Structure formats: C-alpha cells, structure tokens
Amino acid sequence: MVEALLSGIVPGLIPITLAGSFVIAYLQYRRGDQLDL
C-alpha cells in the first residue's frame, strides 16, 4: 500500500521539484541582475 503510494507520488514530485528549483534560480538571477543596474 505505502510502496504503491510512494511509487505514484515520487515520479509526480520530480518535475515539480525541478520546475520549482528552476523558478527559484531564475528569480535569484533576475534579482541579481536588478542589483547590478
């Protein structure tokens, strides 16, 4: 039961985690770009 639940959650969380880390890195890049101006 738990294994089946995890096997369904983990593959769904991977793209969300990648997208979230990409957005955070982009926002930090934009913030640093604004500080340079």
From Swiss-Prot:
Q: What cellular component terms from Gene Ontology apply here? A: cytochrome b6f complex; plastid membrane; thylakoid membrane
Which Pfam families does the record cross-reference, listed alphabetically?
Answer: PetG (PF02529)
Q: How is the quaternary structure described?
A: The 4 large subunits of the cytochrome b6-f complex are cytochrome b6, subunit IV (17 kDa polypeptide, PetD), cytochrome f and the Rieske protein, while the 4 small subunits are PetG, PetL, PetM and PetN. The complex functions as a dimer.
Listed HAMAP family: Cytb6_f_PetG (MF_00432)
Any GO BP: cytochrome complex assembly
What does this protein's UniProt record list under function?
Component of the cytochrome b6-f complex, which mediates electron transfer between photosystem II (PSII) and photosystem I (PSI), cyclic electron flow around PSI, and state transitions. PetG is required for either the stability or assembly of the cytochrome b6-f complex.
Q: What is its main location?
A: plastid
What is the name of the protein in this document? Cytochrome b6-f complex subunit 5
Q: Could you say which protein family the record assigns here?
A: Belongs to the PetG family.
Q: Where in the cell is it found?
A: Plastid membrane
Keyword annotations from UniProtKB, A to Z: Electron transport, Membrane, Plastid, Transmembrane, Transmembrane helix, Transport
